[in-house]
Amino acid sequence: VNDWAISRSRYWGTPLNIWTCSCGHKESIGSISELVEKSIEPIDESIELHRPYVDDIHINCPKCNEQMTRVKDVIDCWFDSGSMPFAQHHYPFENKENFDELFPADFICEGIDQTRGWFYSLIAISTFVMGKSPYKNVLVNDLILDKDGKKMSKSRGNTVDPFEMFDKYGADVLRWYLLYVSPAWTPTKFDVDALKEVQSKFFGTIKNVYNFFSLYANTDNIDP
């Protein structure tokens, strides 16, 4: 695991739980109860912890007794995502049985682009906190490329408008094509002409079978 600068100079996000003093001392608050205990302002555990509300909470500096103020930064959203196994259960403060039953996960599934994102942040945080991986298996779905195997890009002019495909061929044709054209873990070379084949050979066959059945079913008054 490499060094990770988890702070972000943004407004929205999980506030970085660090208070600083003009004397240079820093304090990291580890829980709501600790913040309630140390807060100069009268607050309780129902306090809203997001900005701007948390920025109005100050604590006394244990070094010089001056007022400490929270830094304005928030935490990298990937840290939030990587904390999912613990955060969703508010572990270790509660739901320990639920956590123990579900951790580690049997598998996680995401796109190949999450290798340095969610896959990494999950395993980095879990290994640090729990000493083991948060998942047993990783299922990866690869990227959708153009028919020549090149990345789709507006500058190349090889992008495909899904809504145009829906209108022309139908959503079910597009769904079925993406399911069968290649394994989910390999790149998909998207070929618009192949949609026509799916529409005629697969859905067209189903439609013809139904039409054949309904023709004679109606003639013989069959009620399936």
Where are these regions (language model features)?
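Structured secondary-structure scaffolds
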Residues: 1-219
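Flexible, P/S/T/G-rich "lid" or insertion loops adjacent to the active sites of thioester-utilizing
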Residues: 221-224
